[in-house]
Amino acid sequence: LRSENVKVNVNFKCFSIVVFKLLHVMMKLFLNRLRRDHGVIVGRLSQEVANRQGIVAGHQYICDTMEREGGCLEPGEYHIMVAKCKCFARQMLFLEPIRDDSSSSLPLPETCKLCRMERKSHEFGCLEELYALPCPMMQPGNGPFRLRQGGILIGEAHASGVVLKSQERFLQLYDRMKKAMVRGSDVVVVIE
């Protein structure tokens, strides 16, 4: 009778660990900023790889990143959301900071509303105010000098300020994020 109780307790403990691991699935990305060059910050985006026991085994390279030095995000953790951007008229990867309750960042719909208003009022004039708007997202592009605050270009970094194969790399990353979210994973990027 006593050995049966031990078996039940051991099986229950294993079951609870498996259920906990299934409930808390998270995809963790790391953006390591490697160098600053002529107003550009070049980085590398990689994914944390874990073995079957859940122990981190290493990092898998995904793509290079490029940011404007004056408009880069603060180091920290950011939650990745997929939402439609009014400016690009397509689904984009938005970054939302993971902070305490005293966060002063604007919610996504308000940011997009500001973006629409700025685009309309500066259609034929200076776009400096549009680029100063905070809009943290990962996006395709050729160079970082027209990025808004918090924009991160995805692709292969070559010469100073030039990104190649950006659209291809962005679509690969977007598909990877979308599949993880459909499976119920939280996607987090750690910027270092």
Q: Where are the regions that the model predicts?
A:
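Short, positively charged and aromatic/hydrophobic N-terminal segments
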Residues: 21-23
